[in-house]
Amino acid sequence: MQQAPQPYEFFSEENSPKWRGLLVSALRKVQEQVHPTLSANEESLYYIEELIFQLLNKLCMAQPRTVQDVEERVQKTFPHPIDKWAIADAQSAIEKRKRRNPLLLPVDKIHPSLKEVLGYKVDYHVSLYIVAVLEYISADILKLAGNYVFNIRHYEISQQDIKVSMCADKVLMDMFDQDDIGLVSLCEDEPSSSGELNYYDLVRTEIAEERQYLRELNMIIKVFREAFLSDRKLFKPSDIEKIFSNISDIHELTVKLLGLIEDTVEMTDESSPHPLAGSCFEDLAEEQAFDPYETLSQDILSPEFHEHFNKLMARPAVALHFQSIADGFKEAVRYVLPRLMLVPVYHCWHYFELLKQLKACSEEQEDRECLNQAITALMNLQGSMDRIYKQYSPRRRPGDPVCPFYSHQLRSKHLAIKKMNEIQKNIDGWEGKDIGQCCNEFIMEGPLTRIGAKHERHIFLFDGLMISCKPNHGQTRLPGYSSAEYRLKEKFVMRKIQICDKEDTCEHKHAFELVSKDENSIIFAAKSAEEKNNWMAALISLHYRSTLDRMLDSVLLKEENEQPLRLPSPEVYRFVVKDSEENIVFEDNLQSRSGIPIIKGGTVVKLIERLTYHMYADPNFVRTFLTTYRSFCKPQELLSLLIERFEIPEPEPTDADKLAIEKGEQPISADLKRFRKEYVQPVQLRILNVFRHWVEHHFYDFERDLELLERLESFISSVRGKAMKKWVESIAKIIRRKKQAQANGVSHNITFESPPPPIEWHISKPGQFETFDLMTLHPIEIARQLTLLESDLYRKVQPSELVGSVWTKEDKEINSPNLLKMIRHTTNLTLWFEKCIVEAENFEERVAVLSRIIEILQVFQDLNNFNGVLEIVSAVNSVSVYRLDHTFEALQERKRKILDEAVELSQDHFKKYLVKLKSINPPCVPFFGIYLTNILKTEEGNNDFLKKKGKDLINFSKRRKVAEITGEIQQYQNQPYCLRIEPDMRRFFENLNPMGSASEKEFTDYLFNKSLEIEPRNCKQPPRFPRKSTFSLKSPGIRPNTGRHGSTSGTLRGHPTPLEREPCKISFSRIAETELESTVSAPTSPNTPSTPPVSASSDLSVFLDVDLNSSCGSNSIFAPVLLPHSKSFFSSCGSLHKLSEEPLIPPPLPPRKKFDHDASNSKGNMKSDDDPPAIPPRQPPPPKVKPRVPVPTGAFDGPLHSPPPPPPRDPLPDTPPPVPLRPPEHFINCPFNLQPPPLGHLHRDSDWLRDISTCPNSPSTPPSTPSPRVPRRCYVLSSSQNNLAHPPAPPVPPRQNSSPHLPKLPPKTYKRELSHPPLYRLPLLENAETPQ
């Protein structure tokens, strides 16, 4: 007989790296499909992945080779009706496969891995069928869990939510628990299993357990004890004290402990690894607050308690009293109450175990010391509890329901589910529904005698069933008999029976009766009174649980109505004014994951009230408010409002309070106590929490205003109260730390996993600062040092520098200093790259300079410095550089391809850049321009105030959108680069001043004139110029010298290799064009107009009307630009500042296109007189170069009759390009924008080919910035060109020109320091010698 295959161990040490996490991203997509409005945390998705792999193991156990084999396995192992649904879904997947893959789970990854699981290769359709079944089950689980989460008003699916919801679904639980591959690993019942949790999980679980424990204490006090207190004649005070001991002290302690833990979690700093709960236990332990547990244990475990209780319950009057309260209440008091009184005893031992677990998991030394102090302080109590327990030694058997009354802990629940399936397998003759389909919990088991039967019965009690079995004695060894241990005799559905207590008689003792609805009854008898009490306690608690729950809820509701929360009068405390549409509005049907309403708008007072609300804490609102409040409130005003909010007056005294005051006593009415506990304390605590967040994350407010800091310190020092002491000290500690950091400077001591790579040197050596330049420094080190500099600048930008577009306002130097530094650095670096190119007069030098810049771009890409990449793209697309056709055509093909791929990042609204940014791991330097664009669009497209019933409410929804963008910026500010700073290079790049003393207009004119000088218009060959450099132009390459130095990495991921040599590098050109446009940080406000508003022409407008008859000639990538209405939208280069009021019209740049031999031949017979003269033949003769646009022969002094025709385009795919839904959107006044990028080299739209009559003619005018749609013309260099010999070429017709004057450029808004010599005497290579 063939041996059954062994289950595949998916999570063994060997296999776990191959499988763990394989399905998580796909499962998230499944979750978003079944519940788009919810989210799921990582833990829950990993749990579902584990279940799916269990299911995969179950399917593979049958060794399937065909689809039919899998289908048969599903029919045999899946419960009904889920088997039919799963099969139908899988068959549908196979049918749809013919058209497309409809599945979200990664079939292509699972298919090759199944060979390892099965031991043989299976057909792809078999894998597809299996994956379809797995996806159906995962969707079913997520749908079920999502429904549960939605019903409890949560917004994130957790692992616990999945477990709880699956427990309620009998079909799923049966499918996963019917064999040994079920939830065994999740059903550890030992308390020590919680030790596997981390600190935060332990604290979170403890809060949930304390709340449940508090409800059980409320049940004892408010239901059972109130029943005793309701008849003072029947029960003496001594009777009540003996039964309930000091349970009120235990309740008070539990409320205090729960409040402390919740406050600690709420006040936990984001930088802390976990909440520091040790101080909560330490404070109470030092106060000996846990001592009441010793008294209660002594009273409840003593024999006197049981004797007194039994005597009391034996009195007929007592029985009648309890019976009159509610049906079954007498039995609940007699059997359930004694078990409930044991709950605090065992809960105290739970504290001892919890403190040890927290100490083992704590990552903070101070917290471990607090926990150790608490453990030491409780050692005497623990010794006393052990001594009392051993003295009275109550016997606890497996069936003894001493566990918490309402429900077993989650671990016990899972063990019970496992137990249910095991029990069913051990019962011979089982019929009907499975136990797991009608029960959720296993309660207890044990022997009972059925009156009238010969043999003893073994009873299994569940929350929905009671099963009576007869043991199979000695038959399991005989052939042909079942291996089950028990044989089914009776089943009782708990909701269909009544439990009746039976008094002891001579016929039977320790008996109870089960009476069904048809009046049939069965009597069971236990062996002792203790066993009977255990069975009755379990049966009565199950039967009357809902009754007792309703009684407790009714009491709690009544107390709340009788003791309303009284608040001060709105006349004396304006933060208690009732909510109305005139002071606050909320988002429609939108709540955060915690169920907290999201504020749309409100008055400042209402925003402050919700910021420190007494009913709940909203950390997201606190972060957003402190990031954005400066746009509607000054820091001094905010501090005043918070101090006013903190000083809460007492409410008007009641009559009882007035009477106590008249007697000279302190009023202590119940509603005043509630006011202090439920309003004053939480509000003041949350105000301190706001202060702590303010000084921790926005201390620059206090650095700019020392009076603000003095006011805060003065207020903090005046706060009194033991409950506030810890948080006041925390705030003072943060202030001291910030002051110290301010005095000492920012520390950059960062420890990396591996040492940074050594500094790379080329021609210039260490210490030769005066020789530093683009060609003398190593391209790797240029990219590294620029990346370090730009990363530092990026990481210093604060959210407050962005909110309200303050970098465009009058006080921008004060409000946005770091952002302006980054903008100016990027402008200078872009201009420096342009200057290096155009000042290289010699053609060979110029090609080498451009190649070197592209090498720097490659290293930028591998360092994830997207800002640097787009700086180079902007420089290459500038007017003065873009026109250098001969230079670009002399580049190596692979370098042109690298440049084209980089250019594609900025195309189509930066779609490929956004995809790339999402796919990489930090560290990185994102392109800041997109964030500034989105912030400006949000600021300009949404009003600052909302009109509600004639009132202006602060539009906080607008601030939240801006905060979301700044939050995305901040998520990339945390990870530094593992690189060394070279001080001289840092100083060199920080002091770059390519403009020297020239104005922006003068510098732009100089660059363009220089560009015309080195490559005149329509020249067939570039002019000859002598070389300036004496050193070799050969590049050192961009492969680091890791072999020589033993270095590892330029980043934490390893030093970049060239793009063309890196096999797994993502190619920007290979990203699918059909991908949906990313919406990272894009404003989503419905108020954002899709067309420019009326104010779009203002200086600060985001929406700039496109004017094809104007241009901007600056070379900064931060500047505004006027773009054509083309199919591809690009941000172009412009100025840091607003456009000139009357810009002159530059000439259009004729189109470029690649030379097509076939097209040339086909049109050879159509040559017109307008064509330029032919180039003289050379060896080998180059092909004829077509003019950029047809021009008339002769003197060019008249206008053309019509615009030139658009250039031929490259073949495009069958699918038409996307049509923009709205005009191009631009921003002005310092945001980042790009020059239009060269697309191999560039494309241009016909919109830019304007009638020459509209512009004057000037040979020295820089053309407008080209549009990125026309391919650059490919020049085929002759051998003489390749040897850089330049014979004189025949004249070519002049290019279309525009005005005799350059366009008027905007003035600068900041002053440049004259740190360099005059511009025109600066050579490209400072150490070069002019050849003679």
Curated annotation (Swiss-Prot):
UniProt xrefs under Pfam families: RasGEF, RasGEF_N, RhoGEF, SOS1_NGEF_PH
UniProt domain DH: residue ranges: 198-388
Transmembrane segments: none
Domain PH: 442-546
Top-level taxonomic group: Eukaryota
Molecular functions (GO terms): guanyl-nucleotide exchange factor activity; protein heterodimerization activity
UniProt xrefs under InterPro entries: DBL_dom_sf, DH_dom, Histone-fold, PH-like_dom_sf, PH_domain, Ras-like_GEF, Ras-like_Gua-exchang_fac_N, Ras_G-nucl-exch_fac_CS
Chain segments carrying region Disordered: 1018-1061, 1076-1096, 1142-1332
Name of this chain's protein: Son of sevenless homolog 2
Function: Promotes the exchange of Ras-bound GDP by GTP.
Organism: Homo sapiens (Human)
